[in-house]
Curated annotation (Swiss-Prot):
It comes from Saccharomyces cerevisiae (strain ATCC 204508 / S288c). It is a multi-pass membrane protein. Residues 749-787 are annotated as: Disordered. Keywords: Calcium, Cell membrane, Glycoprotein, Ion channel, Ion transport, Membrane, Transmembrane, Transmembrane helix, Transport. The lineage of its organism: Eukaryota, Fungi, Dikarya, Ascomycota, Saccharomycotina. InterPro entries: Csc1-like, CSC1/OSCA1-like_7TM, CSC1/OSCA1-like_cyt, Csc1/OSCA1-like_N, PHM7_ext. This is Phosphate metabolism protein 7. Induction: Regulated by phosphate levels. Acts as an osmosensitive calcium-permeable cation channel.
Length: 991
């Protein structure tokens, strides 16, 4: 058998990857000060898409001053500046990295001598692995240390799941999340036909303020897509010809200009002067590409007229959208989170399991996959089955190239039986190390990088209701894919290739030989961890792709004001469902080999430490916030750690069987049973609490006397009792119904009043859900009776613990006494105050005293000035000063004392003080397909000094198309410049 190449591969890999990492870090330090938009965009004041609370301070001076600066910040700082999802990602890396370090301290001093001495005298890293042991009694050290190490992992998983549940419950009771529209809306899908009516749902949930159903709006959706496509083409074509006009006149002599204008007979502001009609941009109609498409048309004239026609068609369908077929999904809105949680926790008991598919809470209208709303249970299950089948087939076929990678990692063992590979034996040691260490690790990274986009696409096609569900679907399948390919396939092929000679000679002992050589596969993962630990983090902070897009491709590809604005103001956002599995598989590998080849723990510790630092920088300074998953990837990642524990235990079991060591075998079987029982217990205890918030927790946070957080079981029993209580009330209700004022929309459906066109002058459809002040009487008279008027004067108002008009005994435990909003006293905040988005004399908006108001797409956002100004009190410390190290160590083994509800809540940043007052018009139609509320497009072109843009604006306006050149100009080089936001830009309020 050939000798192991682990030492030469290790040295070659370490040198090459080490030098690569040094180059990446050097480039990062060199380029960062001169390219702040690439390396610290979150600190720039002129990026409009970053709310002030999320903006970070500039990177501290010094090459690595930011490391100490960020590591010294409390968790509250990270929650505010990296988002809840970013915070839990960092926490996950920190937790598993710390456990890897503990494993080094616990396992290496014992297992390395046990493995290395008086064994099989193997070479290289194999000397330090399980396969070098010959004395069967030594295996007791492995089994008992596996108990300790895996037991520690299991307890930490339990402790972190406990923390996550308390964190979620505390977060949901903060002023921000308590008042969100998504926190007050329950989504129920796949409803049975017998209850898919507003009246049926109102009858079962009488405290609902609004019940909205999804509708089949496929025709309207197609029209909106066509309009958006034409608007994009028109905007690109218009800016293209304007750029050409400016280019034709820039740096021209008077003689050349006279020739261009034909001595004054051609107007300067006419596009025909510069670009004749026949030479203007054209495109083909239809969906087929290039010459296979339909008729070729002038883009400017055709799109302008077509958009005007589409505007009229869309307005008609938007005004009459409720007449379409209803879909089996409804959105039940409540005035408070308390009632929404009561509904969410009792939906299954009241409706029955067979009468609906899924119940969801905490998802905004933007989160909903509206195309999935029409699916019935059978259709959704069929889609999921098809998507899962495709994933299984992908895993099977992807195993072949990955298997080649595993074989290459131990290719030197195949030279005796594969003649054409014998030339490898004549290679220098360093080159052999490159082939067996460098080449397979790079190939594996490339192969795995091709998979995520496909998995995300399958998630969307599988019938996921929300984009969060799609993300969690991607996380589950990408992790499964990685475990099978990176661990199982590579381990099997690598160990098989190293034993092929012996298997051919002794086929009956193939299983024993494979088991004994399984630890040799750890050599590949040492190289893989070096790659991930050295080049991974340094490549991440180098931001080479963003640098290329910003400095090279952006300047070539972006020619319109909107393209340039998007390039500058749009930040990259991490997709957590893809980021997590990439780290989880590394954790799985080091757990699996922690007992078999413990030396791997040293490399995993270094790798995870560097990954933590890299993500700490990027999440604070580079990445923007993605859609809000509320940290849901974190508990899934914790549960998926059990995969690594099970695999490690099964591998040890197989090794003990092959070694015929029955004592360690029985002990390992016992621990597998303990692990499985702990896993089942945690799933039953914690998963039902991820989205359900105990009502007592909400009331306790509001300061209602007699309520406290249910620490004993985190509210699990209370949630079950609420379901039984609500079911009992519904069954005892004799009337099974409620009386509500009739709306004009109801009267139109009943043909009692004419269905007039409700479109407004600006093309925005009338409100499909009438607000309280627009209720109509059944009598047909314009005057309403006093009793009806009293009912109709009710308006949904946002109640906030930050308001100066809070009720007695309603003091939030979130904001301590004396820490209410203060008066403005900083110049920056004074500037915000002067730009108050609403009239000082208009009392229709009642924000908290001293709050910083900002107009947004769905209402007004009121922020805490301390959070906006990054004042020290905005970031509470992690641990009270009275907590000594001894006390903290003791509390580690008692999650109830480590994470009491009130303490966790008080540690949140003051950004959770934010309050949002939604517009009534938005609230009434929030949970409808976005195409119902979609506004007419605004084309944004660059203002040229010739006046051509103004002429084109007038021409487009005659066709019903809104074109504007606000906040744009050409610089002295003839390049497009934007000076402010697009005319259709609005800051987004959290929903």
């Amino acid at each position: 058998m050939a000798d192991s190449s682990s030492t030469s591969a290790f040295i070659s890999t370490l040198i090459i990857y080490g030098l690569t990492a040094v180059v990446f870090v050097w480039l990062f330090l060199l380029l960062r000060p001169k390219n702040r938009r690439v390396y610290e965009p979150r600190s720039l004041k002129d990026i409009q898409t970053i709310p002030e609370e999320e903006r970070t301070e500039p990177v501290p001076e010094g090459y690595f001053g930011w490391v100490e600066y960020l590591l010294s910040k409390p968790h509250s700082f990270l929650i505010q500046h990296t988002s809840v999802d970013g915070y839990f990602l960092l926490r996950y890396i920190g937790i598993v990295g710390s456990l890897s370090f503990v494993g080094c301290l616990l396992l290496l001093p014992i297992l390395l001598p046990v493995n290395a001495t008086n064994g099989n005298n193997l070479q290289g890293f194999e000397l330090l692995s399980f396969s070098n042991v010959t004395n069967k009694n030594r295996f007791y050290a492995h089994v008992f240390l596996s108990w300790i190490f895996f037991g520690l992992f299991t307890y930490v998983i339990y402790k972190e799941l406990y923390y996550y549940v308390v964190f979620r419950h505390a977060m949901q009771t903060t002023p921000l999340y308590d008042g969100l529209l998504s926190s007050r809306t329950v989504i129920v899908t796949e409803l049975h036909k017998s209850i898919a009516q507003e009246g049926e749902m109102q009858m079962r949930f009488p405290k609902a303020s609004n019940v909205a159903f999804a509708y089949d709006l496929s025709d309207l959706q197609e029209l909106c897509k066509e309009r958006a496509k034409n608007a994009a083409k028109y905007e690109a074509a218009l800016n293209k010809v304007l750029n050409k006009c400016v280019k034709m006149t820039r740096n021209k002599t008077q003689k050349q200009l006279d020739k261009l204008y034909n001595n004054g007979t051609k107007p300067k502001d006419d596009l025909e002067t510069y670009v004749p009609h026949k030479k203007r941009p054209k495109h083909r109609l239809g969906k087929l590409p290039l010459c296979l498409g339909g008729k070729k048309v002038n883009t400017l004239s055709y799109s302008s007229k077509r958009i005007g026609e589409l505007n009229e068609e869309i307005h008609e369908k938007q005004a009459d959208w409720a007449s379409n077929d209803r879909q089996p999904a409804c959105f039940i809105q409540f005035e408070t989170q308390l009632e929404a949680q009561r509904c969410y926790q009792s939906v299954e008991a009241i409706l029955g399991k067979k009468n609906f598919g899924k119940r969801l809470i905490g998802y905004s209208p933007e989160d909903v996959n509206w195309g999935s709303m029409r699916l019935s249970s059978k259709e959704r299950h069929s889609r999921r089955a098809v998507a899962n089948t495709i994933m299984v087939l992908l895993i099977i076929f992807w195993a072949f190239p990955v298997a080649v990678v595993g074989i290459i990692s131990n290719v030197n063992f195949l030279t005796d039986k594969v003649p054409f590979l014998r030339f490898i034996n004549n290679m220098p040691t360093f080159l052999m190390g490159v082939i067996t260490g460098l080449l397979p690790t790079i190939a594996l990274v490339v192969l795995m990088s091709l998979v995520p986009p496909f998995i995300v696409m399958l998630g969307k096609l599988s019938g996921c209701v929300t984009r969060q569900e799609t993300d969690l679907y991607s996380q589950a399948w990408y992790y499964a894919f990685a475990v099978i390919q990176i661990f199982l396939v590579v381990t099997a092929t690598s160990s098989a290739s190293s034993t092929v000679d012996s298997i051919i000679d002794r086929p009956r002992s193939a299983m024993t030989l494979l088991a004994n050589n399984l630890p040799k596969a750890s050599n590949f993962y040492i190289m893989y961890f070096i790659l991930k630990g050295l080049t991974g983090p340094t490549w991440t902070i180098l931001q080479a792709v963003n640098l290329l897009l910003s400095k090279v491709l952006g300047r070539v590809l972006d020619s319109t004001p909107r393209q340039k604005w998007n390039r500058y103001n749009t930040l990259a956002t991490p997709r957590m469902g893809i980021v997590y599995p990439g780290i989880e598989i590394l954790v799985c590998i080091y757990i699996c080999y922690s007992i078999i080849a413990p030396i791997l723990l040293f490399f995993s510790t270094v790798m995870l430490t560097l990954l933590y630092v890299a993500y700490l920088y990027n999440l604070n300074y580079v990445f923007g916030f993605s859609f809000d998953l509320k940290g849901r990837n974190y508990p899934r990642a914790l549960f998926q750690i059990f995969v690594g524990i099970y695999l490690s235990e099964v591998c040890l079991l197989g090794l003990f069987i092959m070694a015929k060591t029955w004592g360690p075998l029985v002990l390992e079987v016992f621990w597998i049973v303990v692990t499985a029982l702990a896993h089942i217990y945690m799933k039953r205890k914690f998963i039902p609490l991820f989205d359900a918030v105990p009502l007592s927790a909400i009331r306790h946070a509001r300061g209602e006397p007699g309520y406290s957080y249910p620490t004993s079981d985190l509210g699990l029993q209370e949630i079950k009792d609420i379901a039984d209580e609500m079911k009992g009330k519904y069954e005892q209700d004799n009337t099974h119904g409620i009386l509500t004022p009739v709306t004009k929309d109801d009267l139109k459906k009943a043909n009692l009043i004419p269905d007039n066109d409700g479109s407004s002058e600006n093309g925005t459809p009338s409100n499909p859900f009438e607000s309280g002040s627009e209720r109509a009487s059944l009598s047909g008279s314009n005057a309403e009776s006093d009793s009806i008027k009293k009912l109709n004067d009710t308006v949904i108002k946002k109640s906030s613990t930050l308001s100066s008009s809070t009720k007695d005994n309603n003091e939030s435990t979130f904001v301590p006494e004396g820490e209410k909003f203060r008066k403005f006293h900083y110049s920056d905040v004074e500037a915000l105050r002067n730009k108050r988005p609403y009239d000082e004399d208009d009392h229709s908006k009642h924000g908290p005293e001293g709050a910083v108001p900002v107009n947004a797409d769905a209402g007004v956002i009121y922020s805490d000035p301390a959070a906006v100004m990054k004042e020290p009190q905005a970031f509470p410390p992690d641990v009270l000063e009275t907590n000594t190290w001894t006390r903290r160590i003791l509390q580690f083994f008692n999650p109830r004392r480590s994470y009491p509800f009130d303490s966790v809540r008080m540690r949140f940043p003051l950004v959770f003080n934010t309050s949002i007052e939604y517009d009534e018009e938005y609230l009434s139609s929030a949970y409808t397909d976005p195409c119902v509320r979609e506004k007419d497009p605004i084309v944004w072109c660059c203002k040229d000094p010739l006046g051509v843009s103004k002429q084109q604006i007038q021409e487009a306006r005659s066709n019903g198309l809104d074109v504007r050149d606000d906040f744009t100009r050409y610089d002295e080089k003839g390049k497009v410049i934007f000076t402010y936001n697009p005319p259709d830009y609005e800051p987004e309020a959290k929903k």
